[in-house]
Amino acid sequence: MQFKTIFATLAAFAAVASALPTSSSEQNGNGQCAVGQAQCCSQVQKQGKDASDALAGLGLAFNQILDGAIGLDCQQIPVGVLGGAIAIQNTCKNTAVCCQGSANNGLIQTSCTPLSIN
C-alpha cells in the first residue's frame, strides 16, 4: 500500500516537472524558432530596468511580468529567409530574436531570446 502511494506521488511530481517551461533556447538549432516567431528588432532590451526605461521612453506603462527580453520596432522575418534561401544577416541589420508574444498592437514583442544567425 505504501509503495503505491510513493509511486503515485513520484509520478505526479514527474508529470508536473515535465510540464514546466525550461530556460533552454527557443530555437531548433538551424536558425529557426521552435517556439514563437522570428523577428528583426531595432532594439532589444533585457528584462528589468532597461526594459522599463525603454517602455517609459515610449510613454508606455507595461504592467505584465516580462519573461525574457522585449523587442521594440520589430518586423517579422520572412519564411524564405528562415529556410536558408537568403541569409538572415542580409535581411536583418539589427537584432534577430524569437519572441513568444506581443503587446500594444504589435509595437512591443515579449518573451524574446536571441536568434542564432550562424
Curated annotation (Swiss-Prot):
InterPro entries the UniProt entry points to: Hydrophobin
Regions that span the bilayer: none
Extent of the signal sequence: 1-19
Disruption phenotype: Reduces the formation of aerial hyphae. Does not affect surface hydrophobicity.
Pfam families, per the entry: Hydrophobin (PF01185)
Similarity comment text for this entry: Belongs to the fungal hydrophobin family.
Note in the entry: Filamentous ascomycetes and basidiomycetes generally contain multiple hydrophobin genes. In contrast, hydrophobin genes are absent in the genomes of the yeasts Cryptococcus neoformans, Saccharomyces cerevisiae, Schizosaccharomyces pombe, Kluyveromyces lactis and Yarrowia lipolytica, and the dimorphic fungus Candida albicans. These organisms have probably lost their hydrophobin genes during evolution. Mycosarcoma maydis does have hydrophobin genes but the encoded proteins have been functionally replaced, at least partially, by the repellents.
The protein's name in its UniProt record: Class I hydrophobin hum2
Species of the source: Mycosarcoma maydis
Species lineage: Eukaryota, Fungi, Dikarya, Basidiomycota, Ustilaginomycotina
